[in-house]
Amino acid sequence: MQVQSLEVTTGKSSEIEIADGVFGVPYNEALLHQVVVAQMAGMRSANAVQKNRAAVRGGGRKPWKQKGTGRARAGSIRSPIWRGGGRAFPGGNENYTQKVNKKMWAGAMRTVLAELLRQGRLQIIQQEDFGEPRSRLGRDWLSRAGGDNVLLVMGEVPLNLFLGLRNFPRVGIAGWQDVGPADLLQYGRVLLDVEAAARLGEVYG
């Protein structure tokens, strides 16, 4: 399929060919939802740690003898039913990862790229770089590109471009192989350079 490719610095545009099998597929909401949930679950870290009765300090001695006191039998002051005792079913070391097959991941990438293009949130651009790594140049370039809240997906990330844009909080820069469906949906717009569009077409087409 033919789309317009923008040269941000000059404002000129030209037609290029992109893979119809990637950027022209129908929307599959169920697949995209499943893969995005799996990708975000994989980013979770199980930091919460709770102690069971064995991990709580103390409680090695039997509080009172088994029989003859009239009280309920007890073997440890760290029993889960005691105040200050351990948890019966402590949390910690959870594994939140979900399995995503390669074909599912590829299908979700095709779906999100095609839908962003249909919505006008994906723009193909020519690969550019700055003469020097300056945030001032980055700000001017962003204003020509349509403002921030944007993800730049590049075939190869130019160093000066990366250094000139990294200070802006709502601007993401990534290589084409480092982005997933959740990353593409995180920003208002996606700028995809020509090389990245070609590589995505080869891999997911």
From Swiss-Prot:
Task performed by this protein: One of the primary rRNA binding proteins, this protein initially binds near the 5'-end of the 23S rRNA. It is important during the early stages of 50S assembly. It makes multiple contacts with different domains of the 23S rRNA in the assembled 50S subunit and ribosome.
Pfam families: Ribosomal_L4
PANTHER family, sorted: 50S RIBOSOMAL PROTEIN L4 (PTHR10746), LARGE RIBOSOMAL SUBUNIT PROTEIN UL4M (PTHR10746:SF6)
SUPFAM superfamilies reported in the protein's UniProt record: Ribosomal protein L4
Chain intervals with Basic residues compositional bias: 59-70
Cytoplasm listed as a keyword: no
Protein name: Large ribosomal subunit protein uL4
Keyword list, A-Z: Ribonucleoprotein, Ribosomal protein, RNA-binding, rRNA-binding
GO biological process, one term: translation
Keyword Ion transport: no
Similarity field: Belongs to the universal ribosomal protein uL4 family.
InterPro entries: Ribosomal_uL4 (IPR002136), Ribosomal_uL4-like (IPR013005), Ribosomal_uL4_dom_sf (IPR023574)
Subunit: Part of the 50S ribosomal subunit.
GO MF annotations in UniProt: rRNA binding; structural constituent of ribosome
Top-level taxon of origin: Bacteria
Record-level GO cellular component terms: ribonucleoprotein complex; ribosome
